[in-house]
From Swiss-Prot:
<dbReference type="Pfam" id="PF00764">
    <property type="entry name" value="Arginosuc_synth"/>
</dbReference>
<dbReference type="InterPro" id="IPR024074">
    <property type="entry name" value="AS_cat/multimer_dom_body"/>
</dbReference>
<protein>
    <recommendedName>
        <fullName>Argininosuccinate synthase</fullName>
        <ecNumber>6.3.4.5</ecNumber>
    </recommendedName>
</protein>
<keyword id="KW-0067">ATP-binding</keyword>
<feature type="binding site">
    <location>
        <position position="271"/>
    </location>
    <ligand>
        <name>L-citrulline</name>
    </ligand>
</feature>
<keyword id="KW-0055">Arginine biosynthesis</keyword>
<feature type="binding site">
    <location>
        <position position="123"/>
    </location>
    <ligand>
        <name>L-aspartate</name>
    </ligand>
</feature>
<dbReference type="InterPro" id="IPR023434">
    <property type="entry name" value="Arginosuc_synth_type_1_subfam"/>
</dbReference>
<dbReference type="InterPro" id="IPR014729">
    <property type="entry name" value="Rossmann-like_a/b/a_fold"/>
</dbReference>
<dbReference type="GO" id="GO:0006526">
    <property type="term" value="P:L-arginine biosynthetic process"/>
</dbReference>
<dbReference type="InterPro" id="IPR048267">
    <property type="entry name" value="Arginosuc_syn_N"/>
</dbReference>
<feature type="binding site">
    <location>
        <position position="122"/>
    </location>
    <ligand>
        <name>L-citrulline</name>
    </ligand>
</feature>
<feature type="binding site">
    <location>
        <position position="118"/>
    </location>
    <ligand>
        <name>L-aspartate</name>
    </ligand>
</feature>
<dbReference type="GO" id="GO:0000050">
    <property type="term" value="P:urea cycle"/>
</dbReference>
<keyword id="KW-0028">Amino-acid biosynthesis</keyword>
<keyword id="KW-0963">Cytoplasm</keyword>
<comment type="similarity">
    <text>Belongs to the argininosuccinate synthase family. Type 1 subfamily.</text>
</comment>
Amino acid sequence: MEKKKVVLAYSGGLDTSVAIKWLQEKNYDIIALCLDLGEGKDLAFVKEKALSVGAIKSYMIDVQEEFANEYALMAMQAHTLYEGKYPLVSALSRPLIAKKLVEIAEQEGATAVAHGCTGKGNDQVRFEVSIQALNPYLEVIAPVREWKWSREEEIAYAKENDVPIPINLDSPFSIDQNLWGRSNECGILEDPWAAPPEDAYEMTLALEDTPNKPEFVEIGFEAGVPTTLNGTAYSLAELIKTLNALAGKHGVGRIDHVENRLVGIKSREVYECPAAMTLITAHKELEDLTHVKEVAHFKPVIEQKITELIYNGLWFSPLKQALHAFLQETQKNVTGTVRVKLFKGHAIVEGRKSEYSLYDEKLATYTAQDEFNHDAAVGFISLFGLPTKVYSQVNQKKVEA
């Protein structure tokens, strides 16, 4: 019987390594796919590990710039903070992973793709809805969700099948990381009353360990895209990585969040997003300088919906594509420089400038240079307040009657 091919999203961890053996038992040839999203892993080692465990082919693809420009950039421009806190670190990477799974599956003639998600997380939804959107004819296999083993049973299976067991298996934490940040759950973090231990963090320093002197960074934007730090041009991925180091040193971007998952439960997550939080803050300030009031007041409505769509795994939905078009239109004049102070866990905007600035000092000033037409205020107030005045007159008559 000829074996079918399956493309597996491979991380190098225990779950996806065991999944290779498990899929072999189901008569599949496994093609492993590992993406470099900027998490800092030794991906060459991961690629070789997949082959040693039993994959017939192993891909390692650097997608850092694609992730930065096609995914993180939109999140920054839409100021996506789920429930006001979470910058969608993992949620942003899942549609890109799904896209590459489908591309490799079609290239290799595979009939199925597989992922290592459990049956109680958001990621299974994000992967599978994205895959259905891109190629509804591919079978999707979720080994971890199907086998329902305990951790002990999984380790026993790994030992029986000569699957290498990671040396960090005793770590209580479940970690996911990419350019946009780092998420951490499980272990003591499952108690929402417990303070996160310092070893739960990696990208940021504790406040007591941060410098006692602030650091200033000037971020340059072109049509809504961050392009420079302190006058030096970077690719977007490199800019994000550089800013992660700068802001992380000052403790910026630590987030402790009890969030409402798509699957109906609450979970406690600890995030580190130094660059994401700094860029979102700076970008919002530049928009405040360059957007007319109507756009500035309406855009948050769109931002909220975009955030929900991405969190819920609907990156490739028609509505998200339509809202993205609106978002892109709003970025045309978001060009300028923002000065940010990094200090003791805060990214504080202290200055902003733009050739498209709608701030007119001659209209705003209260000095002798004031050019605002004060006399025009009388007629404006009369017309603006007319509906309220008429309503009050009508209702007062009824009360008097």
